[in-house]
Amino acid sequence: MKKTIFIKNALILTVSSLILRFVGIIFKVWLAQLIGSEGIGLYQLIFSVYMLAATFATSGISTAVTRLAAEELALGTKRGTLKILRRAIEITLIVAGVTVVTVFFGAEFIAVRFLNDIRAVPALKILPLSLPFMGISSCLRGYFIARRKITPNAVSQLLEQAVRIILIVVLVGKFCTKGLGACAAAVILGDSAAEIFSFLMLWLIWLRDTRKLDNLTGRARPPFGIVRRILHISVPITSGRYLNTALRTGENILVPKNLAKYPFGGENALSQFGMIKGMALPI
């Protein structure tokens, strides 16, 4: 039985990942045709900051939730399982809140000093709005993995991608005439709205799933030290992710800056960066 569930979950993850990757490539090609290589370059710069902020917001908490919730489920305790999830959400909301304030109020500073492009400011102000929802979604995904239910995660990601594409098509079509800054902001707004939609889906599925935990009658372990246990698991994982994401963000910021030093100029440098990072590498 366990082997069958493992194979089923592995197949669901594999198929959903392939679909997401294929659809993502097709979408990137369409987006590049609409906003051009320079627009893709600007979006990639902003997206680098987005990924760094998302790494801080999620804080490697999903793995901690999966492990600790699985332990509580093995003991047959609903209260302990939900307490783990509640504490994890509290931690991720605190970290996400700090990240939201930092990025939102530091948008102009980040755009001018790091990205070297003032057009990124509107997108950077929109960017952090979805981070708390992304953090909670990460916790819920960890919970569903502990429950050995991969379908909610896969379905939410597929529908999130569908919503993202629809929203970006509509928003970019509406704002693309107002400049590349507006285009980048429209894309980030579509990304953020899709993340919020994914959270709502996972939350509704979670509400329904928790009713099935009522038959768990095991005795919960003492609640002391839950935060410490979560941090003990998540901090080592998070440290590596922070470093990896920070290095990639630094690379994406430095490449167009250095390309701009050569004769083809700043705008062409951003176009070259867009062709490399946003168009060639994804394929």
Regions found by a protein language model. Name each.
Residues 4, 53-90, 145-151:
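Transmembrane-helix boundary and interhelical linker motifs in polytopic inner-membrane proteins
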Residues 133-156:
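Membrane-interface junctions at transmembrane-helix termini in multi-pass inner-membrane proteins
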Residues 31-52, 180, 184-188, 228-233, ...:
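Interfacial/gating helices of multi-pass transporter permease domains
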Residues 156-170, 178-209:
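Hydrophobic alpha-helical transmembrane segments
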